[in-house]
């Protein structure tokens, strides 16, 4: 279910203040994975927390409308051992 249009997109107020006041030379750290990417964020590098570390996300024009958490995966993919990896006796 999408967010109501009359409410507008959610952006963490502290993150929004840093973007309004800051220059895009330094990276901004945030834990707010639910914040929506807005046009004012283009050109910034935002470090998004994935539960363990911060993942650097460079904001581009085609990311507008998505959430920050979409670009910082929380799970590490480890494939199962295949037949080539397992040695036979």
Curated annotation (Swiss-Prot):
One of its GO terms (cellular component) is small ribosomal subunit. GO terms for biological process: ribosomal small subunit assembly; translation. The keyword rRNA-binding applies. The lineage of its organism: Bacteria, Pseudomonadati, Spirochaetota, Spirochaetia, Brachyspirales. It holds the Pfam family Ribosomal_S19. One of its GO terms (molecular function) is rRNA binding. This is Small ribosomal subunit protein uS19. HAMAP family: Ribosomal_uS19. NCBIfam families: rpsS_bact. Protein S19 forms a complex with S13 that binds strongly to the 16S ribosomal RNA. It comes from Brachyspira hyodysenteriae (strain ATCC 49526 / WA1). PROSITE patterns: RIBOSOMAL_S19. Belongs to the universal ribosomal protein uS19 family. Keywords: Ribonucleoprotein, Ribosomal protein, RNA-binding, rRNA-binding.
């Amino acid at each position: 279910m999408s967010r109501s249009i009359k409410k507008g997109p959610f952006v963490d107020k502290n993150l929004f203040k840093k973007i309004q006041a800051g220059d895009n030379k330094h990276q901004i750290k945030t834990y707010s994975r639910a914040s929506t990417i807005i046009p004012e964020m283009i050109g910034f590098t935002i470090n998004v927390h994935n539960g363990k570390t911060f993942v650097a996300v460079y904001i581009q024009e085609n990311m507008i409308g998505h959430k920050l958490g979409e670009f910082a995966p929380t799970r590490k993919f480890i494939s199962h051992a295949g037949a080539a990896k397992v040695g036979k006796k």
